Amino acid sequence: RLTHSSYNVLKRIGSIIEYPVFFDHSNGKENLELHCEYMGYYSPHCVENALEMLDLSKAGNKPVHNYSLGMKQRLGLARAILTKPELLILDEPMNGLDPAGMKQIRDLLKMLCQENGMTILISSHILSEIENFADTIGIINQGKLLR
């Protein structure tokens, strides 16, 4: 059961699953505004800022069903950072992104850590990409931490 204190904790955590889910007939901006509404967090600038950070400003007014997989992935990340969380949990954040998109996300994640002090936990099969920016890497095999 969610209480007022539950929302305070949830605002401190952002997350994205491998294939983020949205209301496809709503546009990107509306999806982010809805997320803000049910999280009890809304600032007129937070949605625009998140769209801009993920290079989705122009696409923000287009229905999500017109988005590519990479655009949906970036919209999912925009949703995850809306509340300026302390902890960001990402499952396959590079999924569906082209090399330029991967670099953009890598640079954004570095910036979020350096400028906002955000802790980021990433689950990924693309170890070579994660090694480009992670400061600590753990490898799990059959439920055991190997490294």
PLM features per residue range, with description:
Residues 33, 37, 44-59:
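Conserved ABC ATPase "signature" region
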Residues 77:
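Hydrophobic anchor residue at the start of the ABC signature
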